[in-house]
């Protein structure tokens, strides 16, 4: 295992509530105490939310496998090889872009109490700036449950598309295969994000982070520097330099502001402690 330097974040009071229900630490709770990027709170989904997360976490990969099969059976071996060679990087890049859009939206618009999106999307992202390593205490369901819940309906729609057409064209089969890879990459994004904050990872993950196949801690640190308004893409971060260079998100904000949709500065500034903190110290190992 590769030992990483500690990654303390900005000082903040221990939170009293989180997007899921929380409970105090006990001697048997394997969650680090407050400090060094941790809130000291064990996160646990509410009962109904937890049921949905568990069902979707285990349903999603089954749907992926079924859809990959039905898409692949319409392709020759040569076509399938071409689709995989071209489709994997396309899906990986597209997932990085969409992860950036979602992250930017959650950081910039709405509030903790925004219907539907507030509790399960906006609040967790913003609290993550204060307690960056809390994500490392999440089990698989807490890590990808919400992502699977959002992606599973897309897989159901894809399955209907593949089964409702008696003669799926090669083009449609190839697009379906790549779309499947894209949803898989989107679900994997929060795992890659979690690894970018982890104190320890195995040698393979560390190697893939250093080679920038996965999101690296050093690169992700750029987002965790106040005012937390850049480098939003968190699948691998490949698109961040380009999007920052063309001021993509600032231009998006200007466009939306022109039609009356303005960033929620008061809510976001409160979470980033008025954007006046010194940059958070994080893991700056090579990567």
What is the role of each PLM region?
Residues 57-64, 141-162:
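Core segments of transmembrane alpha-helices
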Residues 1-50, 81, 109, 113-116, ...:
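Cytosolic/stromal cytosol-facing helical appendages immediately following the last transmembrane segment
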Residues 49-70:
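The first (N-terminal) embedded transmembrane alpha-helix
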Residues 65-68, 94, 98, 102, ...:
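Alpha-helical membrane-inserting segments
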Residues 71-82, 101-112:
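Membrane-interface helix-loop junction between the first two transmembrane segments
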């Amino acid at each position: 295992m590769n030992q990483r330097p500690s990654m303390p974040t900005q000082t903040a009071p221990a939170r009293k509530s989180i997007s899921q229900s929380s409970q105090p630490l006990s001697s048997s709770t394997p969650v680090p105490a407050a400090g060094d990027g941790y809130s000291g709170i064990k996160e646990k989904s509410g009962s109904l939310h937890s049921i949905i997360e568990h069902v979707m976490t285990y349903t999603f990969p089954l749907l992926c496998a079924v859809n990959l099969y039905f898409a692949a059976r319409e392709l020759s071996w040569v076509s399938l090889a071409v689709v995989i060679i071209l489709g994997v990087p396309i899906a990986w890049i597209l997932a990085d872009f969409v992860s950036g859009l979602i992250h930017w939206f959650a950081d910039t618009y709405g509030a903790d109490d925004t219907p539907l999106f507030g509790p399960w999307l906006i609040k967790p992202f913003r609290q993550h700036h204060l307690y960056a390593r809390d994500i490392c205490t999440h089990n698989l369901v807490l890590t990808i449950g919400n992502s699977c819940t959002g992606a599973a309906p897309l897989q159901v729609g894809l399955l209907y598309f593949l089964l409702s057409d008696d003669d799926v064209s090669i083009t449609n089969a190839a697009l379906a295969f790549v779309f499947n890879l894209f949803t898989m990459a989107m679900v994997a994004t929060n795992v890659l994000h979690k690894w970018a904050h982890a104190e320890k990872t195995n040698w393979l993950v560390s190697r893939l982070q250093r080679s920038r196949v996965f999101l690296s801690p050093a690169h992700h640190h750029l987002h965790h520097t106040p005012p937390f308004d850049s480098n939003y893409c968190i699948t691998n971060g490949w698109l961040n330099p380009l999007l920052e260079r063309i001021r993509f998100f600032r231009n998006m904000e200007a466009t939306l502001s022109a039609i009356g949709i303005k960033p929620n500065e008061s809510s976001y500034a409160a979470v980033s402690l008025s954007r006046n903190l010194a940059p958070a110290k994080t893991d700056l190992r090579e990567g």
